[in-house]
Amino acid sequence: MGSPCALGLFCCCSSCFCLCCPRHRPASRLAAVVGGAAAVPAVVSGVTGLILSPSPSPIFIQPTPSPPMSFHNPGLELALDSRPAPLXPLGVTSPSAPPLPPVVDLPQLGLRR
């Protein structure tokens, strides 16, 4: 029927697009399997996760749910922090920032037009 697939599926090149099949690998990034090896060719919309299929019944891919935020990762705290960053008033520099050099006027450098 089909050659064994590395994903544990069977690839029938006449009826499905398989990631493991060298003929179909550039054409499709998704192993569309509906009812075993009898799958329909599908076009995947990466934005919505919806498969546009020529079959009369629509096929939907549900995005994988994100893991619960109960784990503590210090690297993700900054990205997931919902509090706005404190803003300093204009004209006040941070103590850790070096002072800006004074503005140099062009005539002081001897450059003339």
Curated annotation (Swiss-Prot):
Chief location bin: host cell
Compartments, record wording: Host endoplasmic reticulum membrane; Host cytoplasm, Host cytoskeleton; Virion; Host cell membrane
Please report which protein family the annotation says this sequence is part of.
Belongs to the hepevirus ORF3 protein family.
Q: GO cellular component annotations, sorted alphabetically?
A: host cell endoplasmic reticulum membrane; host cell plasma membrane; host cytoskeleton; membrane; virion component
UniProt miscellaneous comment: The viral particles present in feces and bile are non-enveloped, while those in circulating blood and culture supernatants are covered with a cellular membrane (quasi-enveloped).
The segments labelled Hydrophobic in the record are 1-21, 32-52
Give residue numbers for sequence motif PTAP/PSAP motif: 95-98
| Residue span of region Interaction with host SRC, HCK, FYN, PIK3R3 and GRB2 | 94-103
The text the record gives for the protein's domains is: The PSAP motif is necessary for the release of membrane-wrapped virions from infected cells.
Q: How does it assemble?
A: Forms homooligomers. Interacts with host SRC, HCK, FYN, PIK3R3 and GRB2 (via SH3 domain); binding does not activate the kinases. Interacts with host AMBP/bikunin and AMBP/alpha-1-microglobulin peptides. Interacts with host HPX/hemopexin. Interacts (when phosphorylated) with capsid protein ORF2. Interacts with host TSG101; this interaction plays a role in viral release from the host cell. Interacts with host SIRPA; this interaction down-regulates the phosphorylation of host IRF3.
Q: What does this protein do, in the record's words?
A: Small multifunctional phosphoprotein involved in virion morphogenesis, egress and counteracting host innate immunity. Plays critical roles in the final steps of viral release by interacting with host TSG101, a member of the vacuolar protein-sorting pathway and using other cellular host proteins involved in vesicle formation pathway. Also acts as a viroporin and forms ion conductive pores allowing viral particle release. Impairs the generation of type I interferon by down-regulating host TLR3 and TLR7 as well as their downstream signaling pathways.
Segments for region (Homodimerization, and interaction with host AMBP/bikunin): 71-113
Q: How does it sit in the membrane?
A: Lipid-anchor
**Pfam families membership:** HEV_ORF1
What's the protein name? Protein ORF3
Q: Which UniProt keywords apply?
A: Host cell membrane, Host cytoplasm, Host cytoskeleton, Host endoplasmic reticulum, Host membrane, Host-virus interaction, Lipoprotein, Membrane, Phosphoprotein, Virion
Query: Which cysteine pairs are covalently linked by disulfides here?
Result: none
